[in-house]
Amino acid sequence: MARCGRLRAGTAAKLRRWRKGHSSDCNPETRRHRLAARSRFYSRPTEKSNLTVDAVKLHNELQSGSLRVERPSGSSQLPMEEGDAGEAATERSSGTFLSGLSDCTNVTFSRVQRFWESNSAAHKEICAVLAAVTDVIRSQGGKETETEYFAALMTTLEAVDSPESVAAVAYLLNLVLKRVPSPVLIKKFSDASKAFMNIISSQACSGSTSALRWVLSCLATLLRKQDLAAWSYPVTLQVYHGLLSFCVHTKPKVRKAAQHGVCSVLRGSEFMFGDEAPEHHPAAPSSAKFCVQEIEKAGGTKEATTTLHVLALLRDLLPCFPAAVLKTCCETLLRVMTLSHVLVTACAMQAFHSLFSAQPRTSCLPAELNAQIITALYDYVPSANDLQPLLTWLTTMERAHVNLGRLQKDLCWAHLPRLFSATMNCFLSPHLQVVAAAAQTLETLLNECIAPHMDELGNVSASTPAPGSYLCKMFRSVEEGLTYRFHAAWDGVLQVLEVFFEVCGKQCHPIMRKCLQSLCDLRLSPHFPYTTEVDQAVGAAVGAMGPEVLLEAVPLQIDGKEETLDFPRSWLLPVLRDYVQGARLGFFTSYFLPLAATLKSRALEFAQAGKSLESKIYDTLQWQVWTLLPGFCTRPTDVVEAFKGLARTLGMAISERPDLRPTVCQALRTLIHHGCGTDAERAEVGRFAKNFLPILFNVYSQPEEDGGSSSQRRSVLDTVRAYLTITDPQLGCGFLQKASEKLTSPESSEFARLSILDLVVAMSPYANEQALGSLYRTIQPSLQSKDHSMQKKAYRVLEEVCAAPHAPCQAFVHSHLEELQAVLLDSLKSAASPAKRPRLKCLFHIMKQLSAEHEPFVTALVPEVILCTKEVSVGARKNAFMLLVEMGHAFIRFGPTPQEAMERFLLLVYAGLTGSVTMISCTVLALTRLFFEFRDHMELNVVEQLLQNICLLLGSRTRDVVKAALGFIKVVLLLVDTTLLAKHVQTMLEAVGSLSDDMRRHFRMKLRNLFTKFIRKFGFELVQGLLPAEFHKVLVNIRKAEARSRKQRALRQAAAEAEEEEAPAQPKGDSMEEILADSEEEEEEEEERRRGKVRKKQARQKGQAWLKEGEEDEPLNFLDPNVSQRVLATEPSLKKSRGVKHDFQVSEDGRLIIHDEEEEVDNDEAKGVEEEVADVLQEVGLRSKKSQKRRFREEPDDDEPETGTYSQYRAGGSGIHRPLDKKPAFGAEYRSKKGKGDVKKKGQLDPYAYIPLNRAKLNKRKQAKMQGQFKGLMKGAQRGAKAGRKNRLKDRRP
């Protein structure tokens, strides 16, 4: 029990105490509720009102008419002369105080109209001024043009006195001035500038900055609109200098507005974009002089605030200055960088960077001045340990050299060797960012400064004079990076070498041979970690120099006469295979073919001697040599000269070497597609078609035992198709005639006839019309054949002929159109299931050529096409849907209108609803696809009738029909607008609600999916009210799932926002659109104030600098020209944290967001737009259902059933089979089977280490003991995590 009269311990500090002398006060200080209550009884307000004297004065003047819209004289020149507003009669209306705002017709003030709900006094003042000005313009018969608003606002600006009203008027003027015609502003420049300057002088020392900011912006816009002649008057420059003086103002917003205005004047004045624009703005020299004077005036003050402000201004203005004053500014920047003030140096470097990035004209930045700046910047190289300054220096030097290369290539190349040498020193930096930036800098310089001019050079050697000698020096600097002292950055060095080889390898290979040898030796060193990077670099050398140069520098050291089986450079073969292109085909014939023959003979010798291992090694080597052939056939340089010497060997390899057949066929296809760029090359390769095609025909016609596996036969057939594209048409027709003869020959076996038909399919698109007529008569009996394979391939021939774009094929189809229609109709019932896919494709191509007179033919096809939408073959179903859509397009072509045509077509399809159960389900599928494709051509009554018919079908007792009907409703729900669908929602839900119990159980997932979409579209209450009670439980579950999904998304979004780091400051825009764009950020004043303290703290931290002492006990020499490198922006005592950075997602309140691996998220709960589209595509047959995906992720044959009827069991495969080769997850034995988290198991260790919560352990005397226990636990956990990490790394290694 607590003592009477005393408070409980710990509460005294929480009580609020009276101030001395105020213990008798009983009324609270906060009177918010009293004031709210008083306002309801019409009492006079006692708080400060927004009604000011200036507002009343403005109101009285507006109402009395003394304040009139000032129209500029000489209105015949201006767009403001229509009507005489002075004589217009006015009439008081019952408009409200904001009538002029809410119905303002000028789009200039559309931004202001969102202020009327704001609680900000400044926003309310702006709205009041705009409403009053609009009212007075209307009262005088104005048309609310920008010029009228400008005149009224300028008059208002002179009439108001308070800073708030001045700020409001200036804000509106800032908006309207940008749209006022230039002649108006030129004519009124004197009056307007005088008014602005008076306000600026009166508001310069004011505590509020809003009025000053907007007036400065208005002044900048006014100056920007003046013509070139106006800038010859002293008054214009005087006004401009007034604006310029505020660029060093102490208030940040005022300074920002002035700097933005100065930039817009110098870079965006209208006369700068005319045909007779001057090279630079007339005010540019005086602006440069002002900046130099301000910097010199600031001198070496400690904070250098003014200097920083001027440097920020120069960052945007340097590209606008003429060359003479630009040189003075650059000299001033270099002098101020000697102060070793970290922020000043950084801002000066940013100014140089913006100068070079802007790529100014030669009149602004001559090449000589650019080169002088580059030379001077070498005196300001930061320390290798200073991260951010070094990155800035590298980027600036990169832009400087790129700009110099644009101005004068020779001068740029002369300066590049020194930069390469300095940049290579950055590879010794301990910071990975510096190493990556250095590598990126060198790669950019090579690509932008060197690569465009390499074609002008010949071969470069060590004795080549300039400019080739510069390349030698640059390459020597990079090559030095392969020494051991750069070993920590070898990956970056190898990337630079790769780019060097790509850019300069063709011309500079004589000086690169030693480097290639070093790379190959380096790769053979034990435990070398960068073998992939070496392979890429050597591959780049192969692509640029060619394999001949590489093998001269680095011999393959394989000749078939080795005494040992050690082939140290065999790794070159895969590199050559992946990177060789554009090489001489003759080199492969002269070097690699004899080598492959020698290796093959050596393999045979070892096989005969019983040495299987040696035989296998040499056989693999010769196979690797042959795999180089496709690369040599990619854009070879000597096809015409070299192919004839290689053709015979390739033909023998195809016919006699099944193991080489795929490689040789691939090489031939590559040569045809990517090596025959000219007519001469195509003619040379096509000349050997009479030799290659018979060989390929014979190989393909052989059974699989002799002709190879199915993949090899497919490769041979693809090669035949490729070769036919460059074969003489007469020769192709001869081969086609011979194939037709063998096809009808009784001596041909069934396999031979099927193979010949495959070849005929490949040859038919290239035949002439006479050969096609003969071929058609040959295959016509096969169209009625009972052999399904023959029938299918016969239809494939027709498909290729109908789809071919060549003139003979199109002429044949056009001349035989009636006959083809009759044949395809007669075979309606006799067509086998495998033949339906190509048969439907034939009909698809024929349908495109039909006209209105062929409508009976289309009508006769409708039932068959509808039934084919549920064929077993995936390809047949796909083609049936395509044909159905094409038939719809044909009816639209038939006319008379698309709506009537679709109505006639749907009537034909509706007939299927009266057929069998299968026909009904197929018809519903067809209607779903037709609605998806042609909903824009369907009348509203047609859609309503269609929907009613489908709803009736939901009462069917057949699952297939109900399934198809549910799919149609889903498509309608996703595609039709909510307003059109609202009057049918009751019909649809009543039809769905009337499903039988069996149907409801069977389609429970489909119904859940459908109800989710209904709830998302129409709301929970409406759907629940229209469905029977047995569905309510499902609806409640859906609502809970949707709410849970929304909550999880919100948590994920909050965690993602919490993880986002503060974005780095973006550089100011270089384009004129960005400079002249309105800044929305200026309106967020309160937010800026809140951020101010944080910025000041960061600025103080950034402004700190550290001085690096001399080595050992050596005193620091301040007269050393390199002393600036010892001024660091990074605290040297701070060491980089080596802790492991976790990537856990955290919500706003600090909770970890943990996702279980087995946690299944309902697809419909998290579905976005893409998932909804996927649902529609599945229902209309454009995408396979998720439940019907292929089990083995292979490309199936079109005629295989999609449901996997013929697939065989494979243990550990995909689908429902468990992954046998996957290791169990670590800790899986502790995982709970029902709930989440881990559970304890009897006889096993605890799944986690923990300290039990115990109140007794809060005793301070036992604090040291508890800390020791916790530290031991943490150390043990860290050791275990370290060991686990090592084990995971071992498991990942091959």
Swiss-Prot record:
Q: Does the keyword Signal apply?
A: no
Provide the residue span(s) of the region labelled Disordered. Answer: 66-92, 1049-1144, 1178-1225, 1255-1294
How does it sit in the bilayer?
Single-pass membrane protein
Please list the residue ranges that the record marks as compositionally biased, kind Acidic residues. 1072-1087
Q: Where in the sequence does UniProt note compositional bias of the Basic residues kind?
A: 1091-1100, 1282-1294
Disulfide bonds, paired cysteine numbers: none
The Swiss-Prot or TrEMBL record annotates one GO molecular function as: RNA binding
SUPFAM superfamilies per record: ARM repeat
What superkingdom does the record give?
Eukaryota
Q: Which UniProt keywords apply?
A: Membrane, Nucleus, Transmembrane, Transmembrane helix
Does the keyword field hold DNA-binding? no
- Predominant location: nucleus
Question: Its GO CC terms?
Answer: nuclear membrane; nucleolus
Q: Which residues cross the membrane?
A: 905-925
**Compartment list:** Nucleus, Nucleolus; Nucleus membrane
Which protein family is named in the record? Belongs to the RRP12 family.
The protein here is known as RRP12-like protein
Q: What is the name of the gene encoding this protein?
A: RRP12
